[in-house]
Regions:
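Positively charged n-region of N-terminal signal peptides that target proteins for export
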Residues: 1-5
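Bacterial N-terminal signal peptides
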Residues: 8-18
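The feature marks the first
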Residues: 26-76, 80
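Tandem-repeat/low-complexity and Cys-motif detector
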Residues: 56-59, 88, 159-160, 194
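Fold-core signature of tandem repeat domains
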Residues: 70-73, 90, 102, 172
């Protein structure tokens, strides 16, 4: 009886091995969309941002801008522990593939917030800085670099609309305090250091209230030269 059971077990094991050998190897899906899924916990579905109040939108941003920011997190020019952990071992080629994926997405923007604690005077100051700048202090208008529609410029200047006020103010604050950097020439570092906290509160309050235009895509080029040299436009 024991011998019969042993033979049955051996035959069953042999059959299982034969079946495993005959079956094709399981293919594990590995697409850039699946790899980018790690980003959605913070940045929202397909990088379309969340209502969490801080994390920026990724989808539809200029590819060059996204690539530069990923490199900056990897190489220590921008500082965020989670982002650094995510990208610190990734190659330029991998980062460029991620940037191209998110840049190619064309998703609707969420509704623009309707409420603000900013005063009318603050909002007027923010609008003036956005479209006129402050020539006496050497501050160019935001629109001179980010486009008149504020939707960004290819290949490397981001749009300023559809972003949380907290995110905008934290980034301008980081330039003001020398905690954020870019490759030279670092145009935003030069501009950011000239801003006051009142300027930052005003311009970010105004920007956060502006609706995103129907055509939210970055423009191909500015109508004139940049007011300040900027590595963002180095192809």
């Amino acid at each position: 009886m024991k011998i019969t059971r042993l033979l049955q077990s051996l035959l069953l094991a042999a059959w299982s091995l034969a079946a495993s050998a005959a079956a094709p190897p399981m293919q594990v899906p590995d697409t850039i969309a699946q790899r980018a899924a790690a980003c959605i916990a913070c940045h929202g579905r397909e990088g379309a941002s969340t209502d969490g109040g801080y994390f920026p939108r990724l989808s539809g941003k200029p590819e060059g801008y996204l690539f530069n920011q990923l490199r900056s997190f990897r190489d220590g020019r921008r500082f965020n522990a989670d982002m650094t952990h995510m990208v610190q071992h990734l190659s330029d080629a991998y980062l460029r593939e991620l940037a191209a994926y998110f840049a190619g997405l064309d998703l609707p923007y969420p509704p623009t917030p309707a409420n603000t604690d900013a005063t009318p005077e603050m909002l007027a100051r923010g609008q003036a800085l956005t479209f006129q700048g402050d020539a006496a202090r050497g501050i160019p208008a935001c629109a001179q670099c980010h486009g008149q529609a504020l939707t960004g410029v290819q290949p490397g200047i981001p749009g300023l609309l559809g972003l949380p006020r907290l995110y905008l103010s934290s980034q301008l604050g980081a330039w003001l305090t020398n905690d954020r950097h870019a490759l030279a020439p670092d145009c935003m570092a030069k501009v950011g250091k000239k801003l006051t906290t009142a300027d930052i509160n005003a311009v970010t309050s105004w920007l956060a209230l502006q609706p995103v235009p129907a055509d939210s895509h970055p423009v191909a080029a500015l109508p004139g030269p940049l007011p300040i040299r900027c590595s963002a436009m180095n192809r």
